[in-house]
């Protein structure tokens, strides 16, 4: 007679943005499957990966949370969904609502995705300096794209995108602008979900964290979650050299898309970080390329920015410590950029 064994498995069931651990005792020969009601229920639980070939022996270990494997290909799907979810709960939007948002890319893709699933018409207002792939992805989800010319100052262009969206809201009562730069639902999901995922996954104390700043939601939300667990953690903000507004630098145009929008976001907690690391375009590009060729991780340019800073932080903290950062998106939306030039 063939014997069987019971095994214990923990399955994580998604309910909106909260996971519930369910303990299941099952026969090893049985098969348990999870079925999501829609793609939004599959958001999150992205892997944390230890970098093996890009870190010196005398440095802290570097762990990266790879959001390129998230639904929609970026970390911004989390924030897009939570902003819309909260707006629905508060009665701010209905079936006739038109979602309009100014963005340099990934938030727009996330909102287009959420709009497709929830049935909202979505219009994304973007600088014309963002990659062609980002525009096409927004359109592919069924949303509309409005382009604003970037004349060499990304801050001024983002401001014009915002004013365009707000003007549309004044002219049409059905228009809802999520306002990612000041929406508390943005940082809430990063603190309560993304930050929690990191804390649950990492085996031991987290000594350092660094992140580029777009809306400020990632560094504020995750940073606050990590700091509550370890008040002595070292947190660095990261800026592109050509948009180092926190450092008092001049504002131009750069290729580290998704961060360095030339403004200080209202939701950014400027007390959460102790230092600012400035990264040049060339350094961000090379680091992103190294992540592919040395670690097998296909990620975007701002991922290179974050890891370039993480390498510096890891050297400062030294062996035996742990540094965490985020890889915000996937490389496939950068084919037309210098990331894929020889």
Predicted regions and their residues:
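PLP-dependent amino-acid enzyme catalytic core
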Residues: 7, 11, 28-342
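Intrinsic disorder/low-complexity segments in short proteins, especially the signal peptide
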Residues: 22-24, 28
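Cationic, low-complexity basic patches in intrinsically disordered or flexible, solvent-exposed regions
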Residues: 3, 15
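Generic low-polarity alpha-helical segments
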Residues: 12, 20-21
